[in-house]
């Protein structure tokens, strides 16, 4: 289990970027979304979306339906929000800011 400070840092990285939040919000409402869906539905510029998705995957906020050993095979990924992780990050942010 990561320590609370790491969780807080990850939470700040999630919420400091409105584009990250917009993408998470879209995918949460459309689980299993493809990149083309996310581009259209979140109004995220094509040039930014790959970077945003990688950042959210690194934070473990998103999951994809392709196991690591199958990635790079040309298959389109379907993205889903890891709601447990989002709650964990928001709880860490709440605890750090409000001490509760």
Model-predicted segments: where are they?
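Amphipathic alpha-helical dimerization/coiled-coil segments
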Residues: 1-8, 29, 78-100
């Amino acid at each position: 289990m990561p320590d609370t400070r790491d969780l807080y840092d990850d939470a700040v990285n999630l919420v400091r970027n409105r584009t990250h939040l917009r993408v998470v919000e879209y995918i949460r409402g459309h689980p299993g979304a493809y990149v083309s869906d996310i581009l259209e539905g979140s109004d995220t510029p094509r040039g930014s979306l790959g970077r945003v998705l990688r950042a959210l995957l690194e934070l473990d906020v998103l999951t994809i339906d392709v196991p690591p050993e199958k990635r790079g095979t040309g298959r389109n990924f379907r993205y889903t929000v890891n709601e447990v992780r989002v709650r964990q990050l928001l709880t860490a942010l709440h605890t750090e800011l409000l001490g509760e």
